[in-house]
């Protein structure tokens, strides 16, 4: 499964290389490789395949949750599709509250202690996910799992910020899968 997802990412040119001018990742790290999972939303067949694989992954790994939460902004379309496929309510989490209106960081309806899975497009070192997990927990949600389509998987997870938050990161494919199909 993971190698097929990797092939799909390569086919739609989500995997890009730039050896002269490195990409700056969300983590601040520089990389000659950039995986742009946001492109998936524009490719219907590939998107449908990948989202179906996500649903199968949840079943095979017995992930238990009551709500699907999309992280602003890249996680929102995938959370919406997954939520629809598995018939579970959806939320979305902002990086920070809007500062006007109801000044909410989390949109959607939920109850304290409900279990939520955070959906994002990808993760490098997981640092940007901390904001979402902390906001969800502060709101009373139980968060122990994060699901991403692509995970670089090049850092020691246990010593990472997410490892210290006691959350598990799940992915459909990693950098090793991309390399194995190139």
Positions of the model-derived regions?
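Short, well-ordered alpha-helices that flank and scaffold nucleotide-derived cofactor binding pockets
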Residues: 56, 80, 84, 134, ...
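Active-site-facing substrate-recognition patch
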Residues: 1-63
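Short glycine-rich phosphate-binding loop at a beta-alpha junction
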Residues: 63-72, 147-148
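Conserved acidic residues
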Residues: 66, 114, 144
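Short, glycine/charge-rich flexible loops or terminal/linker lids adjacent to PRPP-binding catalytic cores
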Residues: 78-117, 125-130
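PRPP-dependent phosphoribosyltransferase catalytic core
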Residues: 2-12, 134-182
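Conserved hydrophobic/aromatic pocket- or pore-lining residues that grip, position, or stack substrates
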Residues: 28, 68, 90
């Amino acid at each position: 499964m993971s190698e097929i997802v990797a092939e799909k990412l390569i086919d739609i040119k989500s995997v890009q290389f730039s050896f002269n001018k490195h990409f700056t990742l969300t983590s601040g790290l520089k990389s000659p490789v950039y995986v742009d999972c946001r492109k998936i939303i524009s490719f219907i067949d590939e998107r449908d395949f990948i989202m179906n694989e996500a649903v199968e992954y949840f079943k095979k790994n017995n992930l238990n949750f009551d709500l699907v939460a999309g992280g602003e902004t890249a996680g929102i379309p995938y959370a919406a599709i997954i939520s629809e496929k598995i018939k579970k309510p959806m939320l979305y989490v902002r990086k920070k509250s809007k500062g006007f209106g109801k000044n909410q960081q989390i949109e959607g309806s939920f109850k304290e202690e409900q279990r939520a899975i955070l959906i994002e497009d990808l993760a490098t070192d997981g640092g940007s996910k901390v904001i979402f997990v902390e906001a969800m927990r502060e709101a009373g949600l139980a968060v122990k799992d994060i699901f991403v389509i692509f995970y670089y998987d090049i850092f020691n997870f246990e010593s990472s910020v997410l490892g210290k938050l006691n959350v598990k990161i799940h992915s459909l494919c990693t950098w090793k899968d991309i390399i194995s199909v190139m």
